[in-house]
Amino acid sequence: MKILVIVVTFNGLKWLDRCLGSVRASEVPADLYVWDNDSTDGSADWVQGHFPEAKLVRSADNLGFAEANNMGFRYALDKGYDYVYLLNQDAWIEPSTLGTLVAASDAHPDYAVLSPLQMTDGFQALDKQFEKVYAPEGMHFQKRRCATPPKWAPPSYDAEGGTVSGSACPPVTVIRIMAAHWLIPRKALETVGMFDSLFPIYGNDDNWCDRARYHGFKVGIVPEARAVHDRAYRQEPKEKVIYRNYYMGSLVRLCDINRPLWERFLFVCLFTLVKAVKYGSTLPFKHFRALCRMLPQIKDSRLRSAK
């Protein structure tokens, strides 16, 4: 069994020791592939000096998250890896994370993506965005035929301190999951393909999950596995929030091949009005016009995804 952990770096030097070090400490051996997106903080030199075992690629340009990971995908397929694990530069795993996820994937090959619980540093709480995805589908372990552990405890122990068999608990199925921690088996990668170039930064993971479901796969979370996503939550300019939540969210919906394009387009029309009122801004209308101009590319994307 060969696992390739793909890490895309861009000025993330402060996280790299914990990020890459966690892969080195994994109970299940894995190879490291680091694509540096033209960092200016010395990230690439640091990786070369401290993790000589990693396959390090220094890009002359910042290709963005999607295309940089696509380079790693192609490398994994070319070198015959059985699994790829996408790991954000601001994230790290526990020693048991990879082994737990691989065991779950082997037992449930109908999942294209499996994620551990994505938590804050110190394992005090779930990542806020992750919790929005996970909570509606099974925060309570009794729904998964397991004992109920403390809210943030690793579910290898029940409320009385006894062990819980992970094999009795199938993955929690969700619609989408953020790609800070993704285990993808080779078959799923070969079937679903690369990240779509229409989504260089935001939305690529949601689009990939939609395509995976179209091809008959599931997307899931394995609560027996834990990992950290140490992103900072800070106040963002309204323009950036509208771009990410409205524009990229609408683009994901329009490219979702599980629904007819006309249906998605009507939804986005209504979504535009709702967001314009919510944000008190005309920016959603400007972005809507841009989406209309992109309809030929959106149709091409849907055709590619259906192959």
Residue ranges and their predicted role:
Residues 241-252, 256-307:
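Non-catalytic, C-terminal membrane-associated alpha-helical segments of glycosyltransferases
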